[in-house]
Amino acid sequence: YSKNVGFDEQCVRALTLQDVPEGSTFTGKFEGKYNFPDAKPVPARYWHPCVIRNGELMETTAEDFGPDLYAGFLIDFIKRHEDQPFLAYYPMNLVHDMAGGGIPTTPVNGTPGSNKGGSLQGLVEYIDILVGRLMDGLEAAGLRENTIVIFTCDNGENGKKMHASEDGPRVPFIVNCPGLIQQRGATDELMEFSDIYPTLMEFSGASVPDGYALDGQSLVPFLTGATDIHREWITSYIATARMVRTKRWLLEAVDPVYGDSEGRLFDCGDAHLRSDYKDITGSPEALPIRKKLEELLENNPWPDLSDPDVAAEVNSYDTMPYKHFVNGQLVKEQND
């Protein structure tokens, strides 16, 4: 919808694909294989990468580092849109290990580098370098003061996205725009990713079509300083397991199908570390809190087990590790 109000849009994304484009002459490196049937070697994303730019295969060399190319493409896009509003979406391929194992080095260690022998710390530090380049690109284009920058992550640490605990959806979320966003530093306010869409719509001036339901709440009043509060609670689910969190209380791992229908209940207090939460799962005094949190869960989506297709998929969990549901309905084909 941002295009309808004059915005140009750009996506710079690193995909992990098993196949190079049909008819291509890619002669770069390949990673290993993922651990699933009929897996093939994956074209490299880091050193000597396979990069598709506007539908065309780029020619790369052993000295080319994929993340540098992706960031450079976005900086070039910024230069070409100094006089036009734009929305740029940049899902980095950092921080990820290689298909089949191994972590790449970065240009900090010299070029050409290696697709093995690096460290997660090195990749995180290189994210900082790339973000700095993007901010310098905005500054050079005279757009730093009025460009809203959102920095976040798709999920928590390795493996946690497959569990309905706080560790899955808990990620950094930083919003910056010197000429518009009120500087607050770290805050205890809650938000969830469904809030991003209405936030971008409001900032861009785009309108939501009549009858279009939104789950998220715009962050604009909070980000601009019109209010100091945003959300009372957030919720998340993976397959049949759910969680809900307020500032103080956390009910997680509620899974009546494959786990514990009661879940785990914590008093988080003012703590920021999970190790400092107080487990009150079996406390009679906590029953009113539990009831309130369970009501929130019941008013939010999860797989509709009365649907035969959904039930059959759930019953196959012991052989199929990844399941995809949208609004309680099984997504039979996943494009990414």
Summary of predicted features, one role per range:
Residues 57-64, 117-121, 161, 180-191, ...:
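Active-site rim elements
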Residues 2-6, 98-101, 112, 129, ...:
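Histidine-centered active-site microenvironments of extracellular/periplasmic hydrolases
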